[in-house]
Regions:
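Glycine-rich phosphate-binding loop of ATP-dependent small-molecule kinases
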Residues: 1-193
Length: 193
């Protein structure tokens, strides 16, 4: 198996695209450290700290953290994360300022080669998957109204990140409709693994 040249890979896609599932599988296959922003924030939301309460309220409302607040999380987490020389980031960056901040930090710490995998899924498919997830897992951010709001945020704030990431390294857009295995095979194919 060929291992990609990337020091960091970013999994980008709307909620319900399967980026978490595919990111975990890819990280395990390649020996990358898997780091998921959503999981970090859900853990933070369980804490009774002022920041934890704020994060919980934002998650419950289906909203995203402001960039400055996310930078605070990154500054806390990244010194430990970058000890791993190959990292797969899931769920970050979600805005161009987050991308600039994260890439700059990584470059300052010796990371040079970046790849991004954009899992492209139609809005209707994302909604269907998220409603199904809400039925099986209790997620306060998976109601129809909050799903619609988050997918609109993805279109307005996260999609522009794709152009930024393409300028920083390689960007691969993958059709995210199909079985887990079909999507995994598409990713493997574009990465030549």
């Amino acid at each position: 198996m060929n291992v990609p040249k990337y020091d960091a890979i970013f999994m980008i896609g709307p909620q319900g695209s399967g980026k978490g599932t595919q990111g975990k599988r890819l990280a395990e296959k390649l020996g990358y450290f898997y780091w998921e922003m959503g999981g970090i924030l859900r853990e933070e939301a369980k804490k009774s700290t002022p920041f934890g309460i704020k994060v919980k309220n934002l998650i419950d409302a289906g909203k995203l953290l402001e960039d400055e607040e996310l930078f605070r999380v990154l500054q806390t987490e990244l010194p430990e994360v970058i000890k791993h020389k190959r990292i797969l980031f899931d769920g970050v960056p979600r805005t161009v300022p987050q991308g600039v901040h994260l890439i700059h930090y990584l470059q300052q710490n010796g990371f040079k080669d970046f790849g991004a995998i954009h899992i492209d899924v139609p809005k209707e498919e994302s909604v269907k998957r998220l409603l199904e997830r809400a039925h099986h897992e209790f997620r306060t951010d998976d109601t129809p109204e909050k799903i619609g709001f988050r997918l609109d945020l993805y279109e307005s704030e996260t999609k522009p990140v794709l152009k930024f990431l393409a300028g920083m390294g390689d960007l691969y857009t993958i059709d995210g409709v199909g079985s887990i295995e079909e999507i995994e095979n598409r990713i493997d194919s574009v990465l030549n693994i």
